[in-house]
């Protein structure tokens, strides 16, 4: 079976269990070659289940039935996870291979901690290697033992371990739990959300959110984890942090559209613009901003629409949109990115991969707030491959922008809160790049491709009472033509916020696309209360009335639209067709 095939089988068994189709789950697991190692335990659970069924059939009261069923579900989920790991071992999975390597070494996390501490104390170059080893160990172990948890806590509470290294290890816990569910790792992440350095807290909070989405159907079975999540929700900053993470997650889900838009519109038009502007003067050694200040270039750019598109993408970036994926996705082929650990490594200007070169420019790259860490490494590595003269030009251009960034940073009113936002944004972008570009990405579920059922996530679903967050989610669904989900979100938004013509129009359009014409008409009519002269709304409402058989009302609305747009040929044709 291929990696994709076994992941699909694992998901099928998991769905049986979570939907409480236990007989199908038993049958599927017992027929699976790689669950034979646990077949005795599976049969034990099956006999307990049959006993419950016999009690139920006999009408015997059993107050502990739900607890027993929950325990059976947890056991079956564990066996299903273990069988998947065994199968992936047979398929030579790189993740499972890493796990085997560390198991065969016989060295525990505590020993790796000692090695890292020793290397740091003497400023040895081996510290990088030991940090990578700890990351790989944490990420590759399917489940943490009690000792693993103890050693991991020691690492995170060791004041001598740099904050950047701890932030790196947070990502390792996330990757490990994302690859194979582990309540111990998730519990560790929850504890790291509560206190400590903002870089660690930001990554931990984002990791918990992403894992809660990944395992939204599974989490309610783990009562201790739910209790920890409820404790986390008591923190004063919880709701603000949750909103920041959720909004960045949805911004990241929009990356594919932004990338396609950049490639199809901005980049394509820039190429045409450059080709058409060869004769325009003052081109040499100028930045794009300088060129656009040149009167000739400025006029040409305005006529071509490029300046408008650049402003549009600048606005997208200012709102948290990921505009760098289009460029840096092509710069992830360096050997540096063959290592799992390096995709989540906080940017270090003096990292050994640079061989001591480019330190001045790397220091500037480190302070670019809108660029995620893996893109910073891509950028810095790409600069190593260009001639020194071109590199100097890049440095001179960056110095001016760097001063602007410093001034902007000095004007922040909430440095701690803005730092949290930056960490969350860049970390989630790093996760996005990993799941889309890592060469072994097929071993992982793409969190950005699954249905984001936030409303079903325990504790975190409180965010569905926040209008700005619900509006963002609704618009995300709407733009991607997920009309059923968008309609549900718009209904939620109308229940918790002030109504507007735009919300009613979008909601009406969703219901129209779902062929729920009575509901669509209701939404359009409410939109017209706010703005009775909107031709678009009048026409769409008329179409719904026409399909519903109310031709008289459709004609009235078409006539209203005609009065506003008398020369609209399409509108006149619609009226003529209705009058036939």
Indicate residue ranges for each PLM-predicted region:
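Non-catalytic protein-protein interaction scaffold segments in large eukaryotic complex-forming proteins
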Residues: 2-58, 238-239, 247, 252-404
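Start-of-helix register in tetratricopeptide repeats
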Residues: 7, 203, 468, 502, ...
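TPR-repeat structural position
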Residues: 22-23, 179, 483, 517, ...
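Alpha-solenoid helical repeat scaffolds
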Residues: 30, 187-190, 491, 525, ...
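Alpha-solenoid helical-repeat scaffolds
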Residues: 342-531
